[in-house]
């Protein structure tokens, strides 16, 4: 095992060394020469011409390009890329996942790969987890790009389609993962070329995904879905929410304990499954006056009752969701603690939760378009990612995305001290210990960040700290608006911050606080001037550098006063002093209140301390009532505590327990990886179908008129062939052909064939019969063109193709949803669910294509152009 680990580390070291020799050293050697370049934009555009017109490969220009980008950073925003950041930039260009510690400047690193790949002129995307980070990244780095002659844009949900088109037409576009995914789906529902927002020629060329583990692993199981309301009664959800209160939760059968399950239903927390017992089924049938709960007409009711029980037993307010001020049930992301407005649980679960909470039930939705992040990002010609924690998930990145992880060396050594876990018997015993440690450390003035796994825990700890008289700030899904402001100051002396999981991720915690953030925020609030205006940025940088020109630069900002400038200078001095004070105290201290299912999430929390060589420390507090320990840890450890007579206030620090935690985490990670991999296998079936439909649709939307005509004629020809295969197959004699059915089907689609002599086809060979019928249909098509004019005919064909494809695809998605929900039952019949799913999905798709071609034929020949 150690040999394997050593090999992994050796490979990483070798790859880093290769980049140092081929990129970093040559770029450094070019630095002085590059500093003498007067016009960086002109020099950079010359490189672009060499790529686009001169045929030079992008890779061959990485050294001069990186040298120019580094110099642009130094001149424009006062930030020169470190050597380690050059390594990160090269890794991102290579399409790898760059693991970079918190505080190593991922935002600046991305500029290297984005600007470099922008030389191809095909569009580059920087994908972030929220609008705030996208806007800040674009505004902070915008000047660097513009110094190189590049354009930069921000695509968010507030923009009109025309504004979004302009944003995506830029060389570099900052956008959130969800907005980008939805824009892709909306583009594939567009009814005109003008409605497309992504580039028509290269919509998905190159992307860097920030916090890549959050998007491609944590959110991999949550598909992006565009829905339309489907007509379905919702009152039953209220009925079943009341009905299940009369049911009794029982225990499952267990060898040696009980042979039959007890109660009306049992639950399985690990898989979030609910199982009705025979007793429960009988009771429900009696309460609802049903003969058979599982008869075809009652299947919906059985499903809704199961979801009502899941909503009651397995989904909890303040942990899995919140109810906002408008009375809407809003999902809380289990990994980040952020609320996810607009996202809804599927299969009626969201409606069941709404009924449980007594709020208005929204109609169930019908899927119009859907894609998972797993398959979406694989559509890019090239994509890369960056995060502080990726190595633990390298196998998944490699297996699913074909991307390996490169651990980038830190610019300065990490000196953070990570203490062993303290394990308590109960949750309250653990909380008491956390409060005690916070009080003790708070008394010294050290800043403390407390990480929690849920909103419920954060509010419980907040209450305990209030009782203990400890002032603190709370950061969770309920307070996202203040997120950046709270995190920016979480490193000041005496500050205590409670953060749900990784709320605030993406914003650095700077020791002593972030004076630049406060000054910028004050200018925006008091003067109404953007902190990213060039004159404001120049003033803030001058304050930070203690530049004598700060006063002169400040007076160029409209509305600013000398008194404001003096206050800004004093704030900077106080921040510098506090930074040193916090360093002397030991830096930021991290308190983890629970081990997460994933080691990666724990590492993210730890990584908030010790940035850029700062001191810091961390410790996790664990109890045997925590979800991870309760569901997955070994009962022997609890027995050991009992035998030792340990009470709630006594912790243990035992390697056996730490080992049990790590094994539990590894088991959960393996299980979750397995689930994501299975999801991908199923989604790959849908993905191939989606790619085929979207490619066909795009050809129709963007193709020239002659291509539309060719596509239409091809579909009509395929329809004719399918009718001949059905009613006049080659393998049977002419006498057995069902000419009446053939005539009926063809005349229904092509009225002009009313006078065609179908009976005469019997005297022909199958090939001749096909030629005669196709020829008659072609004549009808030409007559239709003449009737409408070629231009109107092409407009009709384009309209019909888009409408028919969209309608059939929507219905197909619904059918696939139903198939996916029921396919698990095949496992009970000793059949492989995936094989069955793939087989049936393929048949359904082929049937859809046949039906689609039939409808296109009917509409082309029957629709009046005025109706189009």
Curated annotation (Swiss-Prot):
ATP binds at residues 85, 103-107, 508. This is Protein translocase subunit SecA. GO terms for biological process: intracellular protein transmembrane transport; protein import; protein targeting; protein transport by the Sec complex. It is found in: Cell membrane; Cytoplasm. The gene is secA. NCBIfam families: PRK12904.1, secA. Transmembrane segments: none annotated. One of its GO terms (cellular component) is plasma membrane. Part of the Sec protein translocase complex. Interacts with the SecYEG preprotein conducting channel. Has a central role in coupling the hydrolysis of ATP to the transfer of proteins into and across the cell membrane, serving as an ATP-driven molecular motor driving the stepwise translocation of polypeptide chains across the membrane. Monomer and homodimer. Part of the essential Sec protein translocation apparatus which comprises SecA, SecYEG and auxiliary proteins SecDF. Other proteins may also be involved. It catalyses: ATP + H2O + cellular proteinSide 1 = ADP + phosphate + cellular proteinSide 2. SMART domains: SecA_DEAD, SecA_PP_bind. SUPFAM superfamilies: Helical scaffold and wing domains of SecA, P-loop containing nucleoside triphosphate hydrolases, Pre-protein crosslinking domain of SecA. It is an enzyme of class 7 (translocase).
């Amino acid at each position: 095992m150690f040999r394997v680990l050593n090999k992994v580390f050796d490979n990483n070291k070798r790859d880093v060394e290769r980049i140092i020799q081929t990129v970093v050293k040559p770029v450094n050697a070019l630095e002085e020469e590059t500093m003498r370049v007067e016009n960086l934009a002109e020099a950079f555009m010359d490189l672009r011409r060499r790529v686009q017109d001169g045929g030079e490969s992008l890779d061959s220009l990485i050294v001069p390009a990186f040298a120019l980008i580094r110099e642009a950073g130094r001149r424009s925003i006062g930030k020169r890329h470190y050597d380690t950041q050059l390594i990160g930039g090269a890794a991102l260009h290579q399409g790898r996942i760059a693991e970079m510690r918190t505080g190593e400047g991922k935002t600046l690193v991305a500029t290297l790969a984005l600007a470099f790949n922008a030389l191809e002129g095909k569009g580059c995307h920087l994908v972030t987890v929220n609008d705030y980070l996208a806007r800040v990244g674009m505004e902070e780095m915008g000047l660097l790009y513009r110094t190189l002659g590049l354009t930069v844009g921000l695509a968010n949900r507030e923009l009109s389609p025309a504004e979004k088109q302009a944003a995506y037409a830029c060389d570099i576009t900052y956008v959130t993962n969800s907005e980008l995914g939805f824009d892709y789906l909306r583009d594939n529902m567009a009814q005109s070329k003008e409605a497309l927002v992504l580039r028509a020629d290269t919509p998905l060329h190159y992307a860097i995904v920030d916090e890549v583990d959050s998007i491609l692993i944590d959110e991999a199981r949550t598909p992006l879905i565009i829905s339309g309301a489907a007509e379905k009664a919702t009152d039953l959800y209220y009925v079943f929410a009341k009905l299940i209160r009369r049911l009794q939760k029982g225990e499952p059968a267990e060898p040696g304990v009980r042979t039959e399950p007890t109660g009306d239903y049992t639950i399985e927390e690990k898989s979030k499954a609910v199982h009705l017992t025979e007793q429960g089924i009988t009771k429900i049938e009696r309460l609802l006056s049903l003969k058979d709960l599982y008869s075809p007409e009652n299947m919906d009711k059985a499903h809704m009752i199961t979801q009502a029980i899941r909503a009651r037993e397995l989904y909890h307010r303040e942990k899995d969701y919140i109810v906002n001020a408008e009375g809407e049930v809003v999902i809380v992301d289990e990994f980040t603690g952020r609320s996810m407005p607009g996202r809804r649980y599927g299969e009626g679960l969201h409606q069941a939760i709404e009924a449980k909470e007594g709020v208005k039930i929204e109609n169930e939705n019908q899927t119009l378009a859907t894609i998972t992040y797993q398959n979406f990002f694989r559509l890019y010609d090239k994509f890369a990612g960056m995060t502080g924690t990726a190595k633990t998930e390298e196998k998944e990145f490699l297996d699913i995305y074909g991307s390996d992880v490169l651990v980038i060396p830190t610019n300065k050594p990490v000196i953070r001290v990570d203490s062993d876990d303290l394990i308590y018997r109960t949750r309250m015993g653990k909380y008491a210990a956390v409060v005690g440690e916070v009080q003790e450390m708070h008394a010294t003035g050290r800043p403390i960040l407390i990480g929690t796994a849920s909103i419920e825990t954060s509010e419980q700890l907040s209450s305990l700290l209030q009782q203990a008289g400890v002032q603190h700030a709370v950061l969770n899904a309920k307070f996202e608006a203040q997120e950046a402001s709270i995190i920016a100051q979480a490193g000041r002396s005496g500050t205590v911050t409670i953060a749900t999981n990784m709320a605030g991720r993406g914003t650095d915690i700077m020791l002593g606080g972030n004076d630049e953030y406060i000054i910028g925020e004050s200018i925006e609030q008091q003067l109404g001037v953007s902190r990213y205006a060039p004159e404001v940025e120049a003033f803030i940088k001058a304050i930070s550098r203690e530049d004598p020109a700060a006063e002169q630069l400040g007076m160029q900002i409209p509305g600013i006063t000398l008194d404001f400038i003096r206050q800004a200078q004093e704030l900077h001095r106080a921040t510098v002093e506090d930074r040193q004070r916090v360093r002397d105290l030991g830096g930021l201290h991290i308190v983890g209140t629970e081990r997460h299912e994933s080691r990666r999430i724990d590492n993210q929390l730890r990584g908030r301390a010790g940035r850029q060589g700062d001191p810091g420390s961390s410790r996790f507090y664990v109890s045997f009532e925590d979800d991870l320990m309760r569901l997955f840890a070994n009962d022997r450890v609890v027995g050991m505590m009992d035998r030792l007579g340990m009470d709630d206030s006594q912790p243990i620090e035992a390697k056996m327990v730490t080992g049990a935690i790590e094994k539990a985490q590894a088991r959960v990670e393996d299980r979750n990886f397995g689930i994501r991999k299975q999801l991908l296998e199923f989604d790959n079936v849908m993905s191939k179908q989606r790619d085929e439909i979207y490619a066909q649709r795009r050809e129709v939307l963007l193709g020239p008129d002659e291509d539309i005509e060719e596509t239409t004629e091809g579909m009509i020809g395929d329809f004719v062939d399918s009718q001949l295969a059905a009613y006049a197959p080659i393998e049977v004699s002419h006498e057995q052909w069902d000419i009446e059915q053939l005539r009926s089907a063809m005349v229904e689609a092509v009225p002009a064939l009313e006078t065609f002599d179908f009976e005469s086809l019997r005297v022909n060979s199958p090939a001749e019969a096909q030629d005669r019928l196709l020829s008659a249909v072609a004549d009808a098509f030409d007559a239709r063109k003449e009737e409408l004019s070629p231009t109107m005919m092409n407009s009709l064909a384009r309209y019909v193709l888009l409408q028919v494809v969209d309608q059939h695809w929507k219905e197909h998605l619904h059918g696939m949803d139903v198939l996916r929900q029921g396919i698990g039952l095949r496992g009970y019949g000793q059949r492989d669910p995936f094989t069955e799913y793939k087989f049936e999905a393929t048949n359904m798709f082929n049937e859809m294509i046949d039906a689609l071609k039939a409808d296109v034929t009917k509409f082309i020949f029957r629709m009046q152009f005025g109706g189009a």
